[in-house]
Amino acid sequence: MKAFLLAAGLGTRLRPLTWTVPKCLVPIQGRPLLAWWMDLFEQHRISEILINTNYLPDPVRKFIKEYNQTRGKVKLVESYEKELLGSGGTVLINRNFVENEEDFF
């Protein structure tokens, strides 16, 4: 099963933490939030996750690259949005990602 992880937002409610760190990489108990999510997705046998990015995309790209190289239980792919599209917009422009899936998260 595949999943969308909507991580492109500005994280305004988490400021000042998100002035320099994207919200999906804010540390919780010493680990980025994205690492906690990956643990959950692995437990639920998600095979591939599309992560949308916009604000501070480079640290997220680095996380994706390192995760794919070291853990790799779930394949992570990025979809960069030059302009934020909202939840529905992200799913719409990436519908081919789940085209042959019966279900997706």
Identify the function of each model-found stretch.
Residues 1-19, 44:
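N-terminal nucleotide-binding beta1-loop-alpha1 segment
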Residues 2-5, 27-105:
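Conserved N-terminal catalytic core of the sugar/cofactor nucleotidyltransferase
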Residues 15, 23-26:
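Pre-signature/interface helix of ABC/ABC-like ATPase nucleotide-binding domains
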Residues 18-20, 75-76:
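Short glycine/proline- and charge-enriched loop/turn segments
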